[in-house]
C-alpha cells in the first residue's frame, strides 16, 4: 500500500508523443559509413568504370538534365581526366547549345586548369552562338583584362558593340578605357553610345565623364548637343527631352558660379516642358532662386512663360478647350484680377464648335465653369444668370441638348430663392429637348427633395408615357410609390409595365416586380407573377430556376425573422420551403421533358443538384441521382450530305417510361390474342 501513488494530479510538465519522437529523431546517431579504400590501379579502373556507367545510364534516361552533365564533367576533372571532361562538356552542348551555365562552367574549368587558349576558343564559340547573352561577353572581356591582354579586351568589346548591347555594356567599355587613362578612346565610345541609346541618361553620363576628364567648354558642348539632338528627334517638340538633362546642366553652371546661365536653363526647361514632366526642375529652380535670387522672380517668370505657352497653343488651335481650361486655372491660381479672368472666359466661350455633340461636351463645361465662378467666387448673381441664359440660347436644341445645363440653372435659381423660375426652366428644358431621360430624372429628384410627391407623380406619368420602352422609369416610379407606402399604386405601375408590348430588358421589371411583392410579404402574388412570366417566356429555364430559388427564401407563416448586424433578415429554410422548391423543380422537369428541351433539362439538373447539396439529405440526393443525364455522342446529317458529331443526353427516367410503355403494348396484344 505504501508503494501506491497518492498524488494523482497531472504533472506540471506534460510530454506528448510528438515531443518524444522529435527528441528521438534529434538524438539519433549517424550510422558509420565505411570509407572506400582503393588499393591499386586495377581497383581504380574498376571504380571509374562503374561510376561512368552510372552517369551514362542516368544520361540515357534523361539527356536534358544539364545538372547531371555538369556533375559528370566535374567528376572527370576530379579524376584528372581532362580529355574525358571536355568530351562530356561537348556532348552536353550538343544536347543544349544555348544553356549558358554549361558554357560558363566549361570555361571556368579550362581557366582553372590554366588552359587559356582552350578557354578563349570556348568564349569565342559562345559569343558567336549567343551574341545576345551579356554574361558571356562580360566573362570574355574580364578574362582578357585579367590576362593583361588589353588590346584583345578592346577587340572583344568592339565585337560586342556591333550588336548594340544595353547600357551596362557601354558603361563597362567606357570604364575599362578610363582605368587605363585612354580618355580619347572613352570619348569616342560615348559618341557611339549616345547614337545607339540617345536618351537623357546617356547624355548625362557623357557630360559626367567630361566633368572628370575634360573642361567646362566640353561639358557645355555635350549638354547643348544632347538637348539639340533630343529636340530634333521630336521634330522640334519636347517628347524626348528630359528634365534631368537640363537640371544637370543648370547644377553644373551653378557650381561654377554661372548663375545667369543656370537661370536661363531653368527658364528654358520650365517654358518647354509640361508641368507633369518638370516637377523636379521646378523644385530645383525654386531652391536655386531661394539661394541666389528672389521668390517673386521665380513666380513671375514661370507664370509669364506658361501664359506665353498657352497663348501660342491657342493661336494654333482656338478650339483646344483643354488648353483653355488650363489657361483659366492658371489665371485663377496666379491671382489675376476678376476682369482679366473674365476676359479669358469670354475669349474661350466665343469659340463655338461645329454641330457635333462630341466637340460640344468640353465646350459646355467652359460655360458651366464660367457661371459657377461668377456666382461663387465673384458673387455676381445677375452675371451668372446671364451666362446661363446665353449658354442655353446658343445650344442647337433641335439636334441635341445638355440636361446638366438646365439642371444647374434650375438649382442656381433655387439657391437664390426663386423656385417658380426653376420649375419654369426645367419645364422649358423638357419642351425644347423633347424630354431627355436625364432631365426627367433630375427634375423628379429635385421635386422629391422638396417633398412635392404629387409633382413627382405627374412628372413620372409623362416620363413613362414618353419612354415606355425603357425599364428604368417604370421601376423608379413604382419604387417611389412603395417608399410612400402606396402598395396598390406601386403594384398597378408594375402591372402596367409588364404589359407593355415592347421594352428593352423587360426581365429587370419582372424581377423588380417579384422583389416588390416579396418585400411586401405577398408571396402568393409573387408566385402568380412567376406563373405569368413562365407563360410569357414559354417556360424559360432561368425563370423556373429563379422560381425554385424563390421558394426557399419564403419563410413560414409562424416563423420569426432574425436580423443580422447590417439589418438584413436571416431566414431559416424550413422543410416546407424545401418541399415547395422541389415541387417547382419537378414541375419544371416535367414541362421541359414534355417540350423535349434536353439541354435545358441538363441545366435544370445542375441547379437542382446544387440545391440538394445545400439543403437536401441522402434520400433526396439519391432520388435526384436517378434523373442524372448521360452525355452520348451522336451523328446527324447536314444539308450538304456530310455528317457532324454532337452531344446528346440520355435521361434514365425517359428510358424507364419507354420500357413501361412497351410492356403495356405487349400486354394489350396478349389480351387481344386470348380473346380471339
Curated annotation (Swiss-Prot):
Sorted UniProt keywords: mRNA processing, mRNA splicing, Nucleus, Repeat, Spliceosome
HAT repeats: from-to residues: 46-78, 80-112, 114-146, 148-179, 181-212, 215-255, 257-291, 301-333, 336-369, 379-415, 417-449, 451-483, 485-519, 521-553, 576-614, 620-652
One Pfam family this sequence matches: HAT_Syf1_CNRKL1_N
Domain of life: Eukaryota
UniProt-annotated stretches for the region Disordered: 616-636
UniProt xrefs under SUPFAM superfamilies: TPR-like
GO CC, one annotated term: Prp19 complex
Example GO biological process: mRNA splicing, via spliceosome
Signal peptide bounds: none
Compositionally biased intervals (Basic and acidic residues): 616-628
Cellular localisation: Nucleus
Chain's role: Involved in pre-mRNA splicing and cell cycle progression. Required for the spliceosome assembly and initiation of the DNA replication.
Quaternary structure and partners: Associated with the spliceosome.
Stated family: Belongs to the crooked-neck family.
The protein's name in its UniProt record: Pre-mRNA-splicing factor CLF1
Lineage: Eukaryota, Fungi, Dikarya, Ascomycota, Saccharomycotina
Amino acid at each position: 500500500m505504501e508503494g501506491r501513488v497518492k498524488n494523482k494530479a497531472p504533472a506540471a510538465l506534460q510530454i506528448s508523443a510528438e515531443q518524444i519522437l522529435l527528441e528521438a529523431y534529434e538524438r539519433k546517431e549517424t550510422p558509420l559509413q565505411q570509407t572506400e579504400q582503393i588499393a591499386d590501379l586495377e581497383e581504380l579502373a574498376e571504380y571509374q568504370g562503374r561510376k561512368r556507367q552510372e552517369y551514362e545510364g542516368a544520361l540515357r534516361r534523361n539527356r536534358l538534365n544539364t545538372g547531371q552533365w555538369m556533375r559528370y564533367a566535374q567528376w572527370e576533372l576530379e579524376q584528372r581526366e581532362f580529355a574525358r571532361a571536355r568530351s562530356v562538356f561537348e556532348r552536353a552542348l550538343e544536347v543544349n547549345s544555348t544553356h549558358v551555365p554549361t558554357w560558363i562552367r566549361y570555361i571556368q574549368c579550362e581557366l582553372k586548369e590554366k588552359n587559356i587558349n582552350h578557354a578563349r576558343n570556348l568564349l569565342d564559340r559562345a559569343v558567336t552562338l549567343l551574341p545576345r547573352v551579356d554574361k558571356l561577353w562580360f566573362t570574355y572581356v574580364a578574362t582578357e583584362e585579367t590576362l593583361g591582354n588589353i588590346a584583345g579586351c578592346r577587340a572583344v568589346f568592339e565585337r560586342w558593340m556591333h550588336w548594340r548591347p544595353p547600357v551596362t555594356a557601354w558603361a563597362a567599355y567606357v570604364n575599362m578605357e578610363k582605368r587605363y587613362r585612354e580618355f580619347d578612346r572613352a570619348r569616342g565610345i560615348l559618341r557611339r553610345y549616345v547614337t545607339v541609346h540617345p536618351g537623357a541618361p546617356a547624355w548625362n553620363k557623357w557630360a559626367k565623364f567630361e566633368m572628370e576628364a575634360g573642361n567646362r567648354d566640353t561639358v557645355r558642348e555635350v549638354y547643348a548637343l544632347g538637348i539639340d539632338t533630343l529636340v530634333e528627334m521630336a521634330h522640334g517638340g519636347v517628347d524626348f527631352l528630359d528634365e534631368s538633362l537640363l537640371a544637370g546642366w543648370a547644377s553644373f553652371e551653378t557650381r561654377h558660379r554661372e548663375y545667369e546661365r543656370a537661370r536661363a536653363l531653368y527658364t528654358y526647361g520650365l517654358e518647354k516642358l509640361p508641368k507633369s514632366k518638370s516637377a523636379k526642375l521646378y523644385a530645383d529652380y525654386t531652391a536655386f532662386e531661394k539661394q541666389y535670387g528672389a521668390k517673386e522672380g521665380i513666380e513671375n517668370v514661370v507664370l509669364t512663360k506658361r501664359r506665353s505657352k498657352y497663348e501660342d497653343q491657342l493661336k494654333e488651335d482656338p478650339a483646344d478647350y483643354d488648353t483653355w481650361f488650363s489657361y483659366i486655372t492658371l489665371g485663377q491660381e496666379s491671382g489675376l484680377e476678376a476682369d482679366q479672368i473674365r476676359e479669358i472666359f469670354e475669349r474661350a466661350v466665343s469659340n463655338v464648335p461645329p454641330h457635333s455633340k462630341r466637340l460640344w461636351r468640353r465646350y459646355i463645361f467652359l460655360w458651366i465653369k464660367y457661371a459657377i465662378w461668377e456666382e461663387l467666387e465673384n458673387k455676381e448673381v445677375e452675371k451668372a444668370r446671364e451666362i446661363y441664359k446665353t449658354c442655353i440660347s446658343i445650344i442647337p436644341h433641335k439636334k441635341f441638348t445638355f440636361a446638366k445645363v438646365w439642371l444647374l440653372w434650375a438649382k442656381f435659381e433655387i439657391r437664390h430663392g426663386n423656385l417658380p423660375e426653376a420649375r419654369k426652366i426645367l419645364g422649358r428644358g423638357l419642351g425644347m429637348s423633347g424630354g431627355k431621360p436625364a432631365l426627367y430624372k433630375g427634375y423628379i429628384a429635385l421635386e422629391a427633395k422638396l417633398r412635392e410627391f404629387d409633382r413627382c407623380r405627374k412628372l413620372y406619368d409623362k416620363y413613362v408615357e414618353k419612354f415606355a420602352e425603357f425599364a428604368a422609369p417604370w421601376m423608379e416610379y413604382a419604387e417611389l410609390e412603395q417608399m410612400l407606402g402606396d402598395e396598390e399604386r406601386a403594384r398597378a405601375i408594375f402591372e402596367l409595365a409588364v404589359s407593355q408590348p415592347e421594352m428593352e430588358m423587360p426581365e429587370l421589371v419582372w424581377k423588380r416586380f417579384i422583389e416588390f411583392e416579396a418585400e411586401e410579404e405577398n408571396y402568393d402574388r409573387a408566385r402568380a407573377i412567376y406563373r405569368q412570366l413562365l407563360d410569357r417566356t414559354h417556360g424559360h429555364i432561368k425563370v423556373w430556376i429563379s422560381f425554385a430559388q424563390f421558394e426557399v427564401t419564403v419563410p413560414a407563416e409562424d416563423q420569426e425573422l432574425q436580423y443580422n448586424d447590417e439589418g438584413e433578415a436571416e431566414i431559416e429554410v424550413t422543410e416546407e420551403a424545401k418541399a415547395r422548391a422541389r415541387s417547382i423543380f419537378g414541375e419544371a422537369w416535367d414541362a421541359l421533358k414534355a417540350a423535349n428541351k434536353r439541354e435545358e433539362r441538363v441545366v435544370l439538373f445542375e441547379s437542382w443538384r446544387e440545391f440538394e447539396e445545400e439543403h437536401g439529405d441522402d434520400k433526396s440526393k439519391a432520388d435526384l441521382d436517378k434523373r442524372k443525364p448521360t452525355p452520348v455522342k451522336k451523328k446527324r446529317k447536314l444539308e450538304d450530305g456530310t455528317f457532324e458529331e454532337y452531344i446528346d443526353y440520355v435521361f434514365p427516367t425517359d428510358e424507364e417510361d419507354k420500357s413501361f410503355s412497351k410492356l403495356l403494348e405487349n400486354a394489350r396484344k396478349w389480351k387481344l390474342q386470348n380473346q380471339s
